[in-house]
Amino acid sequence: MISKINFVKMHGLGNDFVIVNKRDLLSSYDLSQLAKNMADRHTGIGCDQFIIYEEHNDFYEMIIYNIDGSSAKLCGNATRCLAKLIYLDTGKKDITVMVCNKKLLCNVEDENNISVNVGSVSFNEAWMPSRDKIWELAERYMIDLKETICVDIGNPHLVIFSKLEPQDQKIVGEKLQAKELFADGVNVNFAEVKDNKIYLSVWERGVGFTLACGSGACGSFAAGLKLGFIHAPSMVVFKHGILTMKEENGNIIMQGSAKLVAQGEYYYEQ
């Protein structure tokens, strides 16, 4: 049986998403498989992550799938994209998005400036692999563990401030997904600080390298503040643009753009 699914494709600084309203999905769909099909850049629409949203009385629920069909707990760029989509559909400027019971407060200042308050973060040293497990990797790629920190921003991030070459970043990002290091995988952030700005590349679990990562920007900003490498406000720089970062009463707030790319119908064969 072939069915039609309405979709919107958007991106935040090149980090791209296929977004669908839950009301357009049949209960019989295998959502993990649907995510893999629609995310495929050759046989589907193509995206970094597949987003399902549902309207409730005073908030919007967002469900995130990676391209491998696994679920994700947070995505900052997708949140900005969804907030803009809701704004374009309804005119609402203040929007609450819920992801895995985490409340994200969004404000659409205009079509090119959407802010997201992701709340507070925690620095969970219990996530960090024991020194003997990670020492060989750190030594081989000259990673200073004193400048490496785990951040929980709703999803797990490891922020590395040591400078690595791009080819080494890929190797390290892959190796850190080993279950004996991080049981559920981890998002790996390679951060370099210049003039109070963080230049960032992120290996996202279940995806690989993406052109930008909003939650990674928030986690790296928080890590930079904690380690004294930057002060607020600051900016996180990606290949296709920047996110402006600030801290208010212990909450991390990012601001950036979100772009509408296309909308249409996807033909899904079960």
Swiss-Prot record:
Its EC number is 5.1.1.7. Its main location: cytoplasm. Substrate binds at N15, Q49, N66, G76, N77, N155, N187, E204, R205, G214, S215. Pathway: Amino-acid biosynthesis; L-lysine biosynthesis via DAP pathway; DL-2,6-diaminopimelate from LL-2,6-diaminopimelate: step 1/1. One of its GO terms (biological process) is lysine biosynthetic process via diaminopimelate. The keyword Transmembrane helix does not apply. The active site is at C75, C213. It is found in: Cytoplasm. InterPro entries: DAP_epimerase_AS, DAP_epimerase_DapF. It is an enzyme of class 5 (isomerase). One of its GO terms (cellular component) is cytosol. It holds the Pfam family DAP_epimerase. It catalyses: (2S,6S)-2,6-diaminopimelate = meso-2,6-diaminopimelate. GO terms for molecular function: diaminopimelate epimerase activity. Keywords: Amino-acid biosynthesis, Cytoplasm, Isomerase, Lysine biosynthesis. The keyword Amino-acid biosynthesis applies. The record marks H157, E204 as: Could be important to modulate the pK values of the two catalytic cysteine residues. Belongs to the diaminopimelate epimerase family. PANTHER family: DIAMINOPIMELATE EPIMERASE (PTHR31689:SF0), DIAMINOPIMELATE EPIMERASE, CHLOROPLASTIC (PTHR31689). Homodimer. Catalyzes the stereoinversion of LL-2,6-diaminopimelate (L,L-DAP) to meso-diaminopimelate (meso-DAP), a precursor of L-lysine and an essential component of the bacterial peptidoglycan. NCBIfam families: DapF. This is Diaminopimelate epimerase. It comes from Rickettsia akari (strain Hartford).
